[in-house]
Structures are given as C-alpha cells and as structure tokens.
Amino acid sequence: MTATLVAKDLAGGHANRTLFSSLSFTVSPGDVIGVVGANGAGKSTLLRLLAGVDVPLGGTVSSAPDGAFIGWLPQEHERIDGETIEAYLARRTGCAAATEAMESTAEALGSGAPGADDAYAAAFEHWMASGAADLEDRAPATLAELGFTLPTETLMTALSGGQVARVALAALLLSRFDLVLLDEPTNDLDLAGLERLESFVSSLRTGVVLVSHDREFLARCVTRIVELDLAQNQVAVYDGGYDSYLEERAIARRHAREAYDEFADKKADLVSRARTQREWSSQGVRNAMKKNPDNDKLRRKASNESSEKQAQKVRQMESRIKRLDEVAEPRKEWVLQFEIAAAPRSSTVVSTLNEVSITRGEFTFGPVSAQVNAGDRIGITGPNGAGKSTLLKLLLGHLAPDSGSATLGSSVAIGEIDQARSHLDEDTALGDGFELAVPQMNPAEARTLLAKFGLKAHQAASLVRDLSPGERTRAGLALLQARGVNLLVLDEPTNHLDLPAIEQLEEALESYEGALLLVTHDRRLLDNVRLDARWHVEAGKVRLGINS
C-alpha cells in the first residue's frame, strides 16, 4: 500500500527557538523529496515531525489513509548493547513493533477483553503488511546481495562502520513501508552501496523524504527539494531535481539582491534629494532675512512663498519615501572561510612503501609498493573493508608492516582527519583539548577559532565524546587551520558535514599546495577536487593510476 503525507503551515524547533515555520508540501506516491539546509536548520526535526515522533510548534501533519505505515530511519551514532543483526533488522523495518502489537492484542483477545477482536484483526493486518512473517527468511539473501556474510546472530557492536552501513541498507531494502523518511542514508556507504541505494529509492512506488549531503545522490534521486534556509529565516519548495534547484536558488538569490539594491539606491536618492531641498529651503529663508532687513512686506511675502514651495517639495520627497515598498536586505549566510595552514616544505619523498604486507585476522593487505612525493594530490577509492584505512596507516607510520619496508620522509607535518574523528582526547572538554593541541595559540584565540567553525561556548564546554559527528569533523578542520601541514590526510571528510561546509572544504583544498591523500566515496568531491592520481584499493591490493 502507498500513502500520501501532507504538511500544512508546519513550524518546528525547540521550546525556546523556532527553526522553520509556514512550511507546506505534499508527499505523494513516487515522490522523492530531498530536504537541504545547513546543520542546525531543522532537517532532522522536520523528519521527526513527519514521523509523528515530535509535536509541531504550529501547523499539522496528516496522512491518507489514516494509520499508514510510515518508516522513519534516523541516524544512529550509537549501537545498542546486546542487539544482534537480526534484532536490528526487525527494529529498523518496524517488524519488531508490529510483532509486539500483534502479540499484545492476541493476549487481550485470549482474555476476552472488549473490542479485542477488532484490535487483533488490525494488528494482524499490520503485521502481515510489515513483512514480519517472512523477515527471517528474506534477510540472509538481502545481506548476501550486499556482500555481507556474517551470521545474523552477530552483535551489532562487533561490526565495523562499513559493515553497520551495509546492515542499515539491508534494513531499508527489507522494509515494506507505505512512506519512507530517511536521515543521511548515504553515510559510510561505499560506491556499490550508494548505487544499490539509488536503485532502490528510484524504484520505490511509495513516497520518500530524505536528508542527505551527498550531492550526486541528490542529483540522481530527488524529484523535489525542500530548503530550510536558516540564514534567511525562510523555507521554500522547489520542483525538479537537485541541479535544477541549485540553478533556481542562484537566480532567486540574485533577484533578491538586485531588488534590494534597487530599493536601497532609490531610497538613498530620495533621501538625498529631500535633504538637499530642506537645505535649500533653510538657505532661502536666511537669504531673504539678509536681503530684506527693512521687512518689506511684498518681498517678505515672495520669500515666504518661495520657502513654502521648497518645503512642499521636501514633503513630497518624504511622502515618496514612505510610499516605497520596503524590501528587506537578504541576510548574509554564515561562511566557514576555511584555510589549511601550510608548513615548510617536506623532503621530496613524503612516504614510501616497498613490497609491504600486513595480516590482521583473515585479512591480508599487500604486497604493495607505492610512493607519495611532495605536492602529490592522490584520491583513494575502494569498497568498504578493502584496506583503504590500512593503506593510510602504513603510509603515515601508524602501522608497522609484517614484511617489506615503510618509510616516512623528513620534515613531514601531518594533518589528519580519520573516520573515527579521533584527533582530540575523548574525555576532555572540547575547548580544553583544543587549547592543548594548539599551544601556540592563547585561549581566547583558540575559542575564537572554534567559534569560527560553528562551535560555540556550550560545545566548547562539552566532552569530546558527547559531540555529534559533524561537530567532531568541524573541530578537526579547525585544527588543520591552526596547525601548519604539508601532508594532508582526509578519510571520508564529508561524512556529517553540511553542504555549505563541503563546498568550503573544496575551496580550501584548491588553494592548499602540500601533498594530499583523499579517501572518499563522495563522487562530486572526487570530481571537484584537483587530483594528480587515483589509487583504487580492493581486496587488499592497490591499483595505482594517473588521474585523467
């Protein structure tokens, strides 16, 4: 079954702050609506309102038919202790809740509770529609299709980030929702996973509302865009795909700026003319008094009439100013203005691997020979679990090979953002840890730099472990700006960054002149960043290639 969702004059936010208001749109079967906006604009808040998890500050959300099976798949940064893959799939597909409801109504039916027969019939119908009846049979094949071979009894806490991403994708593929709400579904997916997700979303007959910072995914999948513009305190709905939205938004912003500039120029001109007329009027009165000391009545009358004409012109100008249609000045958006500080040049050869191999459990990486020279800009791609992070650790000297040799050059100043965002002590307040990491800055300078990256006083006082992944990433970028580096290592840097920050990162990378190792599944980032070579890692082997 499919469903239609209607948001009317919706307002959302927190008790003391409204993030958006007057938002109206309809999600019909087959629609794929992308929600975009800066971090903190209320994207996840909107999904929670559409899911019925939170109560809106204003407006309504309704579905047709009533009781439609709406699936809300939020980001989950923490895993539940003791939860198996099987239990995770049941929970994320809604099958666990449907089973619990059916068992509860069956118990009421058995005890003869009034109305239990109707409640049980509805619960049983929902249980069947959710796919709970055969989920256990369908799950292994779907997991295998995604290259996942571990048994479903495996604990989720035992999985790597890439494995968790594949299980999360499997939950989506196994779901049978009437309408789907997805919050950052592309995070941690490799290229194969992204393509499978795109295929699934594009083939759905149900409506989809999704939040994503993956520009290529948005361009390939969405049919409409809902923009939450925090800077302008506006909401807008754009028909068409993501690239069409970018063009329309650019035109709308240009027109808004032109309209304001025209209004401001016209108002300034009228104000200037009114001021001039007022000065002329005052000067005329003074001149008349000087020329007519004898108070000749006729001359005095003529002077007064002239002054009155000037005053009338002033009033006309002031009236024209009041009649102007006020045009609000477009607010300037917060811009990161991110720069990567440069260190003195390193040795000509930055890092070398010579027939390097390393084995961890059943996984063997290598043998690999590779070299990074000063100023090289290398993009590294490959499936999750292929060995990309292992390659980085060997190049940086974080891992010692079992065989072969790994050499790091002299005067290499490394700036690194790894997938774990582990650049600061987890048990230290962000502000304190940042100050320790950049001793050359005084505390005020360090806090100012954090604020520049959108990390305000309350975040600086929070423990690093309590920060969101996006906040951790911005803290890592702030460190790169504070320290001088000549070897920049970025492992999935766009995960958890919003679109404006991703664009700022691209600009910073364009002006950075040191060596760069960029691991990413972000296809637009790979296309937009200037690279000299691309290395592809798969099954522990590295294929070196020149970027075309």
Regions found by a protein language model. Name each.
Residues 1-258, 341-548:
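ABC ATP-binding cassette signature C-motif
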Residues 108, 115-141, 257-364:
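Flexible nucleotide-interacting loop at or near the entrance of a catalytic core
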